[in-house]
Amino acid sequence: MATKKAGGSSRNGRDSAGRRLGVKKADGQYVIPGNIIVRQRGTKIHPGMNVGLGKDHTIFALIEGRVEFLTKRNHKIVNVKEIAST
């Protein structure tokens, strides 16, 4: 048996909390201006029509409507489609 504690054990034992990234609103889901659609590191998903891009690459809705995800030329894009008023 060892008479001393393992060398690195006192320097271990910490972990950072998860950053809560990912898609926050699904395809076809209703959003209002300011709703966060995607939280991400870098532009894994690119902004399309009627969405804004924050300085931390958060994609958010600029208008009221429904979320639409699509792929163009190997780029994932998110749009917000305006709901036709009746």
Swiss-Prot record:
Alphabetical list of Pfam families matching this protein: Ribosomal_L27
SUPFAM superfamilies: Ribosomal L27 protein-like
GO biological process annotation, one example: translation
Gene Ontology CC terms: ribonucleoprotein complex; ribosome
GO MF annotation, one: structural constituent of ribosome
UniProt keyword terms in alphabetical order: Ribonucleoprotein, Ribosomal protein
Presence of keyword Transmembrane helix: no
Region: Disordered, residue numbers: 1-22
Lineage top rank: taxon: Bacteria
Protein family: Belongs to the bacterial ribosomal protein bL27 family.
Protein name: Large ribosomal subunit protein bL27
Organism: Rickettsia rickettsii (strain Sheila Smith)
Lineage: Bacteria, Pseudomonadati, Pseudomonadota, Alphaproteobacteria, Rickettsiales
